[in-house]
């Protein structure tokens, strides 16, 4: 856990490193509660618009640090040029398919009654391939390529409805593996919309 926290600190230089480290470590001394999220991230692949969706579950430590796992998938049709050796491709294009698992950590550095500001960071690894049609009209998939991403961001969240958080943010997607084999530029700004459910608060209220 300390190594994960340290990595997040190194990638969030806008804030005091020692304060960030201390607050995160102190939050891990509290009893965690369950948290879940659904988010949408809009971005680009070279000159093509793309939308990623993700769902995640994790643990919330004192509303300061959240850690967990997520599943991400490409939710829009992204058509890219495609040429294959020994295979004729209809229109010389294919549809990108991509999905990956992520580990995420989120540090909330400012909390008010109805809103908060956070630095979420996620690292993901998964697979991508192209689905194309042959000249005869058959659907085929290219060989899957391993992809890996690092995605830091800055988000603002509003909790006007009890147990529910709605947020907006911006960040950057850095592709660590796969860009050369996919022959495209996946490094790009990311614009986020997220929906979060505070299950821990629900459970606490039910028990009380």
Please report, for each region that a protein language model flagged, where it lies by residue:
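Bacterial Sec-dependent N-terminal signal peptides
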Residues: 1-24
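Short glycine/proline- and aromatic-enriched beta-strand/turn motifs that initiate or cap beta-hairpins
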Residues: 18-67, 196-208
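Transmembrane beta-strands of outer-membrane beta-barrel proteins
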Residues: 32-38, 67-69, 101-103, 117-123, ...
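Residues that define the transmembrane beta-barrel architecture of outer-membrane proteins
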Residues: 32-34, 49-53, 97-101, 115, ...
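Transmembrane beta-strands of outer-membrane beta-barrel pores
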Residues: 40-44, 71-77, 123-129, 172-176, ...
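Outer-membrane beta-barrel translocator domains and adjoining extracellular loop/strand segments
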Residues: 48-50, 80-85, 129-138, 178-185, ...
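Gram-negative (and chloroplast) outer-membrane scaffold detector with strong preference
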Residues: 64-137, 158-160
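Predominantly the C-terminal beta-signal and adjacent terminal strand-loop region
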Residues: 155-208
């Amino acid at each position: 856990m300390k190594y994960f926290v340290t990595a997040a600190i190194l990638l969030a230089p806008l804030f005091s490193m020692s304060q960030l480290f201390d607050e995160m470590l102190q939050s891990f001394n509290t009893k965690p509660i369950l948290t879940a999220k659904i988010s949408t991230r809009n971005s680009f692949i070279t000159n093509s618009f793309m939308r990623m969706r993700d769902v995640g579950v994790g643990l919330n430590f004192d509303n300061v640090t959240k850690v967990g796992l997520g599943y991400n998938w490409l939710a829009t049709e992204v058509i890219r040029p495609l040429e294959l050796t020994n295979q004729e491709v209809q229109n010389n294009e294919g549809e990108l398919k991509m999905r990956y698992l992520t580990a995420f950590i989120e540090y909330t550095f400012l909390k008010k009654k109805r809103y908060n500001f956070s630095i979420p960071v996620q690292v993901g690894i998964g697979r991508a391939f192209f689905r194309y049609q042959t000249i005869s009209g058959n659907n085929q998939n290219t060989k899957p390529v391993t992809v890996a991403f690092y995605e830091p961001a800055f988000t603002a969240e509003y909790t006007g409805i009890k147990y529910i958080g709605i947020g907006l943010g911006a960040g950057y997607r850095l592709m660590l593996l796969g860009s050369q084999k996919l022959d495209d530029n996946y490094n790009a700004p990311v614009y986020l919309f997220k929906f979060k459910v505070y299950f821990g608060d629900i459970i606490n209220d039910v028990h009380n």
